[in-house]
Amino acid sequence: MSVTKKPDLSDPVLKAKLAKGMGHNTYGEPAWPNDLLYMFPVVILGTFACVIGLSVLDPAAMGEPANPFATPLEILPEWYFYPVFQILRVVPNKLLGVLLMAAVPAGLITVPFIESINKFQNPYRRPIATILFLLGTLVAVWLGIGSTFPIDISLTLGLF
């Protein structure tokens, strides 16, 4: 047996919410059994089919065998460490580089306290957090791309 909450359209508070485009979660169809028995298995099986299909259609190519006696000219880390690698490579003082890396999560922790005066959930109404996110993403991509270039053109990406 499922229980659904029928909307009481004579309620002035609900009418005001619906007029503003809010209040759509106050009623509707139940999660059991509709979502849990019908939608989730379809999503799980669809994701599984996509992964299997991609692995069959485009298998990963094997690289050349490793040679322990030949060291490459420049060793690069995995792609997700590129921005951190670039910070350590560009900053002359290694302690300053480590402090800059520690400043990133410390700065992210302070964002909710800076935005605490703003009560909106909409990211378009939280300009400080949105600007910090966009700026941080841009800097991380810039540093990540720059870490693949030689050290003399890594900050300018060879553009300037």
From Swiss-Prot:
Membrane-crossing residue ranges in chain numbering: 36-56, 95-115, 131-151
For this protein, the record's PROSITE patterns field holds:
CYTB_CTER
Keyword terms, alphabetized: Chloroplast, Electron transport, Membrane, Photosynthesis, Plastid, Thylakoid, Transmembrane, Transmembrane helix, Transport
Q: Where in the cell is it found?
A: Plastid, Chloroplast thylakoid membrane
Annotated GO CC locations: chloroplast thylakoid membrane
Query: What GO terms in the biological process aspect are recorded for it?
Result: photosynthetic electron transport chain
Q: Which cysteines are joined by disulfide bonds?
A: none
CDD domains, per the entry: cytochrome_b_C
Give GO MF terms, alphabetically. Answer: electron transporter, transferring electrons within cytochrome b6/f complex of photosystem II activity; electron transporter, transferring electrons within the cyclic electron transport pathway of photosynthesis activity; oxidoreductase activity
Q: How is it modified after translation?
A: The N-terminus is blocked.
Keyword field contains Hydrolase? no
Question: Topology in the membrane?
Answer: Multi-pass membrane protein
Q: Short name of one Pfam family for this protein?
A: Cytochrom_B_C
Location (main, coarse): plastid
User: Domain of life of the organism in this record?
Assistant: Eukaryota
PANTHER family referenced in this protein's UniProt entry, alphabetically:
CYTOCHROME B (PTHR19271), CYTOCHROME B_B6 C-TERMINAL REGION PROFILE DOMAIN-CONTAINING PROTEIN (PTHR19271:SF41)
Q: Give the multimer and partner information.
A: The 4 large subunits of the cytochrome b6-f complex are cytochrome b6, subunit IV (17 kDa polypeptide, petD), cytochrome f and the Rieske protein, while the 4 small subunits are petG, petL, petM and petN. The complex functions as a dimer.
Member of which family? Belongs to the cytochrome b family. PetD subfamily.
Its biological purpose:
Component of the cytochrome b6-f complex, which mediates electron transfer between photosystem II (PSII) and photosystem I (PSI), cyclic electron flow around PSI, and state transitions.
How is this protein named in the record?
Cytochrome b6-f complex subunit 4
Q: Encoded by which gene?
A: petD
